[in-house]
Amino acid sequence: MNDAIGRIIAGESPVFLLIAGPNGASKSTYTATRLTPIGFPSVDPDKVALEMLGRHPKTREEALTATIESTRRVRHNFTERRSIALESVFSDTKGHKLALLNEAKTQGFKTALIFVGVDTPEICIARVMDRVDRGGHDVPDELIRSRFPRCFENLKAALEIVDLAVLIDNSGCYGVDGGRKPRDSDDGRGFGFFLPDVFSLTS
């Protein structure tokens, strides 16, 4: 785990941790390998959908129902002043996740963003195809492509809100471009090393 994230989690204030990034960027892998082993609670809308439906959503309405329930669970933790993480593709156009970050700050939570990014939507599409081959859920290619730039636009806005942000370049995972391992970084303020590339992708 990034040292800065470890420090904020170990602090006295409750923490709202948003794990964001495009489809197939390995957000759930981050949760499973970094947060679950230390007992940090998290909400994954995909898992919530499985709990509610017994399968992955097939319609927009079903996906929205899982999203609403996920938000309800996060807000319950806000009320109880308990730390919580939420996974998100971070592509909504109405700013709901940004509003959650602001809501958490208003209620005295520390806010942290883990952004798991990749270079292109084609990497996301390849990852999702691999996930489907292994029994995971599918996401249409065009939906992945349309979400990709919105995800980075929301990242820009989130960086103005959160107390800490760490950006993870996961483009090389699974050997997509030569087998590089995922990298994460922060510069003391918590802003990741590939931030200039983020802005160039959305400018």
Q: Where in this protein do the model-derived segments appear?
A:
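Pre-Walker A adenine-sensing motif
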Residues: 1-10
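Conserved GTP-binding G-domain of TRAFAC-class P-loop NTPases and closely related GTPase folds
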Residues: 10, 14, 126-203
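Glycine-rich phosphate-binding P-loop
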Residues: 16-35
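Conserved substrate/cofactor phosphate-moiety recognition/catalytic segment
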Residues: 29-82, 95
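Conserved beta-strand scaffold positions in the cores of enzyme catalytic domains, especially
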Residues: 40-42, 111-113, 165-167
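Conserved nucleotide-binding/hydrolysis micro-motifs of P-loop NTPases
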Residues: 47-49, 91, 117-123, 172-174
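Short, hinge-like loop/turn segments at secondary-structure boundaries
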Residues: 59-62, 104, 129-132
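Glycine-rich phosphate-binding loop used to anchor ATP phosphates in small-molecule kinases
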Residues: 65-115, 151
